[in-house]
Every structure is written in C-alpha cells, then in structure tokens.
Amino acid sequence: HNYYYYVLAILATQIITNISTAIVVDKMYPRYNPEGNLDKDEIQQINHKIRDLFTSKIGFVVVDSADTIVISAFLGLTALAIYQNYFYILSSVMEFIAVVFTSCTAGIGNSIIVETAEKNYNDLKKFTFLISWISGMCLCCFLNLYQPFMELWVGKDLMLSMGAVVCFCVYFYIQEINKLFNTYKDASGIWHEDRFRPLVVALTNLCLNLLMVNFW
C-alpha cells in the first residue's frame, strides 16, 4: 500500500509542477497570451499530431514496463530484483547520454526549418556517427566491467549469466541509436508517418517476453 501512495505522490507532484510552471510563465510573459480562433483544418491537424504523439509515447512506455511486469508475474520478486540491479546500471548510463538528445532537439528542429535537406541529412550522419561511437564505447565497457562490478556490489548469488549481459548490451546499443532517430522525429513532428511502429514494437516485445520467460 505504501508503494501505491508513492506512485500517487509522484503523479500529484508532477501535476503541481506543471500548474506552477504555467502560472509562473503567464506572469513572466503576459504579452504572449493567445488570441483568436484556429481554423477547423488546423485544429484537426493538431489533434492528429497529438494523437500520434500519444500513441508513440504509450508504445515506448509499454516496452519499458512489460519486462518488469512479466518477470515479477512469472519469475517472482527475487528474479525481478536481480534484473532491476542490472537495469539500474544500464539506465543510469542511458540518462547521461539522454542529456545530449534533450539539448539537441530544439536545435535540430530549427535546422529542419531553416536549412536545406542536404544539410540536415549530413548533420544526421554526423550525429549517427557520434552516437554510434559513444554507444560502442559504453557497450565495450559494459561487456568487460558489468560482471566484475555486479560481483563486488551484490555478490555471485545475485548475478545473471554473461548471456544476459550481452542481451543488455545489445538492448543498450539499439535503444541509443533509436533515440537519435526519435529525436529527429520529435523535432520535425513526423509522428503520423511512424504511428504504428511503436505499437508493433510494444506488442512484439510483450509476445517475446511471454515466450522467452518460459525458457528461464
């Protein structure tokens, strides 16, 4: 029950933060209050984009949540705790790299508007090389340091096999490359063209979870 209160507290805190931010922004920039009405076509287009963005985000939330739910339901909390220890290390490194994507999104969006398609394509190739290099270096470190660190941290009794570490590393690399393309997708607002992929990925991930959990 305490955990449920904790989750509700997170939700309430986020709502309060959003409301406070809106109030502060209105006071700091009163001259930017919207006036007039939008055309029906513009409203419909905005609704389509919001719906497609919502679908995209829901798909990625399901992907991240399905693993935890399936492991806890089929293998128990002990296996889930071991998995979460490994995933905690992985996600911590991913958060550091996420700073790069977050800081570049606005600049990428501006470049898509004001620069040529050739310039944006060249930038995408440079970003792809940079993220591939950073992710590759992290992947090599994971392969060599994951197990020794986990042995020092939790002991041999609470460790996964090396095969699981390889799976974590593959997941990490794919996620980082995918985040780059998602950054460009978010910056350019092309969620409609890609609206089904997150749902297909989420469904595939759930099916593979239910299938592979039987081989644990």
Regions found by a protein language model. Name each.
Residues 6-23, 56, 60-64, 87, ...:
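Short runs within selected transmembrane alpha-helices of multi-pass transporters and secretion channels
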Residues 29-31, 90-128, 182-187:
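Helix-loop junctions and terminal segments of transmembrane helices
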Residues 3-4, 78-81, 159-162, 191-192:
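Residues that define the loop-to-transmembrane-helix transition and helix capping
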Residues 61-92, 110-111, 147-157:
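Helix-terminus/linker motif at the lipid-water interface of multi-pass membrane proteins
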Residues 3-10, 21-65, 69, 107-122:
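Interhelical loop/hinge segments that connect adjacent transmembrane helices in multipass membrane
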Residues 50, 54, 58-70, 74, ...:
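Short helix-kink/termination motifs in transmembrane helices of multi-pass secondary transporters
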Residues 75-78, 112, 189-191, 215-216:
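Membrane-helix interface residues
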Residues 122-176, 203-215:
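Alpha-helical transmembrane segments of multi-pass membrane transport and lipid-handling proteins
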